[in-house]
Amino acid sequence: MSEAKNREMFEKALEAIADGQEYLALTYIDQASTMENEPLYLSSKALCVAKVRRSFKEAIYLCRDALEFEPTNPVHHLNLGKIYLLAGQKKKALSTFYDGLKHGRNPSILSEMEKLGVRKSPFFSFLARRHPLNKYSGILLSKFGLR
C-alpha cells in the first residue's frame, strides 16, 4: 500500500475515533500498518485496542512507546489516561492527565478531568478538606472569582 493510501486510512481512523466508532477506527488503523513507527499511530491504535479488544496491557505498552517518541505531545497523555480509565485505574489516569497538561493546555484533557470531577486543592493545605476554614474560605473566594 502506498504512503498516501496509508495516510488516508489513518486520517479516516482518526475521524472514526472522534465519532466514537472504535471498531471502524481499528480496522482503518490495521490497514495503515506501515505507519507503525509514528507516535500518533501507536497512541491511536492503543486507544482502539483498549476499547475494542479490552487488552489493556497491550494498549498501555503501545501508548508508552508513543510517549517515548514524543513525550511532550499531550494527545498521547490523553490517550494513555483514557486507557487507564477503561482499565479502572483512576489515580494513574489523573496523574497522566496532569502530566499532559504540563506540556500544553489540551481542552480534551481538561474535559476528561472535568468528567471525573477533579477538585481544586484546599485553600489551607495543612488542614483537612472538611475543615470549616477550608470549606468557607473556598466558598467565599469562588464567589469573588478569586479561585
Feature annotation, model-predicted:
Residues S44-A46, N79, E112-M113:
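Canonical tetratricopeptide repeat
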Residues A66-K91:
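Mid-chain, well-packed structural core segment of small domains
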Residues E11-A18, Y23, T27-V75:
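Alpha-helical adaptor scaffolds
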Residues L85-K135:
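TPR/TPR-like (Sel1-like) alpha-helical repeat modules
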Residues M1-E8, A32, E36, F123-R130:
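TPR-adjacent "capping" and linker segments in tetratricopeptide-repeat scaffold/adaptor proteins
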Residues M1-K5, G20, I139-R147:
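Long, contiguous interaction/recruitment modules in multidomain scaffold/adaptor proteins
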Residues F10-E11, L80:
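Alpha-helical solenoid repeat scaffolds
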Residues L47, R64, G81, F97-Y98:
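Amphipathic alpha-helical segments within well-ordered protein domains
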